[in-house]
């Protein structure tokens, strides 16, 4: 396997050399494509920040940037005095074996599917395995091509974490597309208990190609000539709202593909996601746009190292750069408008960018090798969606599920808090092992804060009931005085305080706490001007306290 990888890299380098052309010829070629691929020397890191606003910086290699630009961007760079070194487009360095969809049983994942074969595969999986898989698309582009998905669960997705795997937002980065198709095949056909457990416990969405116009730019029967950008010359991974650089950081309107994906994220509250790219071998975790660390930076390093470390069991040189296969996006090079940052900040979804091959458009004969490298890591990343703190939030009176905010105190910010969602009221919070103060809050309900401890690779189920505001409390609020008697905190989660304006009249009086059935649960005497009564032994619910003939209602939460 290592020899095969070495062969693939050598072939990539040789083909790049073989296809070297004069700069004038390359410029003419790229003008016909409307997309330029080039390198720029980098003198200072600050220059990368400036250039990422002028073109699509794809990666930083030593002291040079590898970039893409559309016609307008390229002319602007030239006008500003930059001298790009044009490079052969990745998808034009060789001709690629294509599969037209015939003889599916003999297909060995070593040729790229034509568009029609890709579409047929997606639909046939759902038709052949309806108990596991459903097919849907997000809509039809002007070209007639679709953004297609397969969705996997056991037929009962409510209350389960939702997971999103996608690839090829850049049309010429095809390794991830093939990994996604093969994972779809495994989820449909395998009866391994591990796969069945994933189908039972998760609601999984997979889209192998989210930029089909870029991938099949040269026509539906080939990926030769595939482009990074979409049909409107837009880099889709710079086209999302950016919390630090505004709603349109690329200066373009939201593209049809972007709108479709944002609508999907609004409809389905994904817990975790990954988006596969090519051109490097590294897991790029948040943020891309922002230097301060993500609140869950330690968790991100944990799960990213797990992914990369598992690939090293097959080849220690694969995903070995940076911090042993992982990198903070901003530390590598900043970009603005990435889907990763959009999903993390705006959609409360932990999404990572996985760069899975140095060649952008590898020879498809190497695809089985990349599957071997990534297979276990892909399953482990899916399973990470099951760890952390999970549960349901419901109304303490009616039992109805609630849409509540679940916030880790002194920890969450920049969109890292999660929510519970209807119809089940379920929430899912992946987090690094530790002890946390977790607050559950919902409009119209008293908040509740719990101290929870969870370990790495552990699942903690914590269901929570919230008490409606004003439930069982007299008009005027829970601490409104009546003939000088005041009780607080109300609701309480442990200690009830009783005060009287005229302590002498209450001193040594007996208090009695009863439930809704009238049963006496606690009694005692008033012995202090501010009497503390321990009610931590009482279950959640509404109670009455009676002192000297006066009765107050209170709630234990």
Predicted regions and their residues:
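C-terminal outer-membrane/trafficking sorting elements
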Residues: 18-22, 477-557
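A short, solvent-exposed beta-strand micro-motif common in secreted/extracellular proteins
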Residues: 433-444
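Active-site/substrate-binding loop(s) of hydrolase catalytic cores
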Residues: 142, 157-305, 313, 317-320, ...
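Short, acidic Ser/Thr/Gly-rich low-complexity loop/linker segments typical of extracellular
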Residues: 400-432
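Active-site-adjacent mobile loop/cap segments within catalytic or ligand-binding domains
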Residues: 272-295, 325-383
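Structured interaction patches on ligand/partner-binding surfaces of diverse proteins
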Residues: 443-469, 556-557
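Bacterial Sec-dependent N-terminal signal peptides
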Residues: 1-29
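A short, amphipathic beta-strand motif
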Residues: 389-396, 464
């Amino acid at each position: 396997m290592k020899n095969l990888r070495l062969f693939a890299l050598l072939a990539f380098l040789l083909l790049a050399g073989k296809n070297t052309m004069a700069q004038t010829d390359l410029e003419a070629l790229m003008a016909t494509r409307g997309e330029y691929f080039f390198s720029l020397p980098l003198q200072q890191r600050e220059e990368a920040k400036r250039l990422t606003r002028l073109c699509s910086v794809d990666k930083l290699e030593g002291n040079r940037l590898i970039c893409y630009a559309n016609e307008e961007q390229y002319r602007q760079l030239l006008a500003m005095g930059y001298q790009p070194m044009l490079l052969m487009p990745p998808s034009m360095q060789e001709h690629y074996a294509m599969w037209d969809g015939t003889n599916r049983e003999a297909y060995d994942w070593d040729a790229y599917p034509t568009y029609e074969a890709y579409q047929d595969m997606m639909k046939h999986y759902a038709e052949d395995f309806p108990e596991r898989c459903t097919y849907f698309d997000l809509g039809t582009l002007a070209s007639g091509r679709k953004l297609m998905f397969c969705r996997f669960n056991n037929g009962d997705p409510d209350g389960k974490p939702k997971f999103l795997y996608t690839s090829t937002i850049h049309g010429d980065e095809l390794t991830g597309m093939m990994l996604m198709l093969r994972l779809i095949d495994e989820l449909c056909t395998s009866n391994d208990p591990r796969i069945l457990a994933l189908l039972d416990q998760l609601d999984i969405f997979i889209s192998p190609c989210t930029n089909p116009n870029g991938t099949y730019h040269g026509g539906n029967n080939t990926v030769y000539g595939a482009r990074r950008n979409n049909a409107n010359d837009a880099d889709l991974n710079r086209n999302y709202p950016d919390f630090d650089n505004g709603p349109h950081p690329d200066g373009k309107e939201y593209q049809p593909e972007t709108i479709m994906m944002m609508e999907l994220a609004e409809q389905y509250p994904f817990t975790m996601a990954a988006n596969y790219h090519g051109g490097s071998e590294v897991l790029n975790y948040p943020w891309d746009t922002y230097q301060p660390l993500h609140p869950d930076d330690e968790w991100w390093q944990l799960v990213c190292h797990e992914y990369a470390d598992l690939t090293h069991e097959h080849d220690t040189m694969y995903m070995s750069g940076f911090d042993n296969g992982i990198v903070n996006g901003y530390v590598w090079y900043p970009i603005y408008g990435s889907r990763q940052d959009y999903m993390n900040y705006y959609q409360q979804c932990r999404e990572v960018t996985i760069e899975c091959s140095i060649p952008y458009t590898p020879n498809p004969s190497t695809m089985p090798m990349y599957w071997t490298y990534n297979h276990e890591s892909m399953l482990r990343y899916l399973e990470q969606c099951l760890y952390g703190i999970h549960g349901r939030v419901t109304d303490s009176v009616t039992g109805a599920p609630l849409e509540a905010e679940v916030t880790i105190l002194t920890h969450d910010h920049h969109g890292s808090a999660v929510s519970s969602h209807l119809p089940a009221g379920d929430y899912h919070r992946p987090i690094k092992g530790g002890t946390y103060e977790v607050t559950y809050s919902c409009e119209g309900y008293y908040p509740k804060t719990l101290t929870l401890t969870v370990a790495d690779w552990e699942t903690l189920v914590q269901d929570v009931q919230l008490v409606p505001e004003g439930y069982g409390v007299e008009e005027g609020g829970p601490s409104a005085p009546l003939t000088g008697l005041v009780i607080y905190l109300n609701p309480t989660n442990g200690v009830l305080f009783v005060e009287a304006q005229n302590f002498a009249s209450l001193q040594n009086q007996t208090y009695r706490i009863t439930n809704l059935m009238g049963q006496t649960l606690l009694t005692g005497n008033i012995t202090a001007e501010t009497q503390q009564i321990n009610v931590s032994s009482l279950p959640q619910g509404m109670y009455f306290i009676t002192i000297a003939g006066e009765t107050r209602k209170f709630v234990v939460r």
